[in-house]
Amino acid sequence: GIRLPENFFSPYQSTNLVEFWRRWHITLSRFLRDYLYIPLGGNKKGEIRRNINLLLTMVIGGIWHGAGWTFVVWGGVHGLWLAATHHFGKYFEAVPRCNLKVVGGLLTFWFVVSAWVLFRSPDIATAVNYLQNMYAQPEWLAVGHPGIFKDRLIGVMVALILVCYYLPNTQQLFGDHHPSIPSAQLCPEERTAKVNLVWRPTIKWAGLVMILLLTCILSL
């Protein structure tokens, strides 16, 4: 059959933004690295030049998604956070890795989700309004507010977070069958699933897939 390159590899499990871009839109990030970042000088000409190269690369990557100021700012904030990750990372080498994973994962998730507001908004003013409602005046935190925090939705969100963070992705689930061309950007540790679950052509798996399919159809 046809094997395509990996393009997304559980990006929301990333513990920092550098790792996020190794996992997110792998073909695009590889293109930006090989044809923009490295030709600009990469990290070979000092920290300041590296940070400038990162910022330029991410801004151009933002414009690639669309010709609007929201995409420019989205790329810019990603470039700045990447530069900060490289700069401050050396100061945390003595911190236990397990602690870095927890704190880094939460910070990365918060930043990426906040930045998506810029990506999805039609203009800067709308993005600022959304962010103000999220952080400056978060009415959704009010007790009894009829927003997203209903009892049933809280359970669904917690379940989905656990699924996204702990269960293997499709490449890991079907890894024995080599469904895609592995990316060299990911290290072995990043490829290891937290839960060892592998698909097999068995009656049990067929039944599970049928249950999931029926659940999806009935939820339409």
Question: What positions do the PLM features span?
Answer:
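Soluble catalytic regions of membrane-associated enzymes that act on cell-envelope
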Residues: 8
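Non-catalytic, membrane-anchoring transmembrane segments at the edges
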Residues: 2, 14-33, 37-220
